[in-house]
């Protein structure tokens, strides 16, 4: 019988098909320790999950890991859910993780601190974004479990302190896998309503695992995005969750949250009573002072003798009118005098007179300018004639007219000595009326005795 050989690829695909069609391997929960953790630039996570005796490669793609509530690290113990498959290129089986959460309280605390630091850096805890709690809320929304002590304590406290307040309960899961989405949905539903003044979000006490829904990032961001002020009331006084840091106000217990959400109607009634009494006292004092003022006015001279007051005011009016007429006449007289002074000044400084004076001054300056120019021209003319005569006396042409000439070498240089010329050289002699080109037949130097 002829043997049939499989290719490595065919065998690997066969094994992969067997694994992927095994229903027990399509939804596997594993727990182990992370090692060789790598975070790819595209958002994928690659790591090894191991225990004391074995290890398995693990991949968590970006679409699944963006919702996990902590940052995985080497050495962290985790619980993962995923499916088993084969990576054909290396022929190794690995788990494709769909969900991951810390394993144990220590790792929950680590995830809590990681999220707390990240949200604080983003500013979700800043007081800048805290909304004020209304002093007199008409409608109070309560997001908690519909059963248990928390809802009972909140409603009892609100009805005792503020019976006129309206309470709307949004029942949610407060622990477990689906608690966080349930709380987020309730916050969003409450914000879609227009008649809720304040929200209380919380539950009774419990372990860190039981309170973990209030440490979820989606709950923190829903609280931060709420347009309705939120009071957090999670656990006991010593319990602090991420929701407490993001909320607009943190209450140590659900009962305390109810007390912070509404005023005490008995205290309000006492304040109203005190202010009513103060208002009544103030009104009595005002009425008393007005009555005393009225009595004083009734006893005054104006009320007792109004006719005399009227006649006095008429006399004062007549005097004021006389003073007004006199003041008007004085004012007119003053303005007439000012007008006369201005007329005299304008006549004295009339433009025609100033133009005439300026014209005479210009004519005088023109005559003076002509005289000065003539004098300067004559002076310059005399100087020019003198300098021209000096130049004429010094001119080489003047000397040439007396029979002298200038001798030039072939290089057109003036010859000053017979030593600069040799027999046979050609020289040029410039005379008054032209130039002679001459050949030197001999050179004779003057003797020391002048011969």
From Swiss-Prot:
It is found in: Cytoplasm. Coiled coil: none annotated. GO terms for biological process: DNA catabolic process. InterPro entries: Exonuc_VII_L, Exonuc_VII_lsu_C, OB-fold_nuc-bd_dom. Its EC number is 3.1.11.6. GO terms for cellular component: cytoplasm; exodeoxyribonuclease VII complex. GO terms for molecular function: exodeoxyribonuclease VII activity; nucleic acid binding. The keyword DNA-binding does not apply. Keywords: Cytoplasm, Exonuclease, Hydrolase, Nuclease. Its main location: cytoplasm. Bidirectionally degrades single-stranded DNA into large acid-insoluble oligonucleotides, which are then degraded further into small acid-soluble oligonucleotides. Heterooligomer composed of large and small subunits. HAMAP family: Exonuc_7_L. This is Exodeoxyribonuclease 7 large subunit. The lineage of its organism: Bacteria, Bacillati, Bacillota, Bacilli, Bacillales. The gene is xseA.
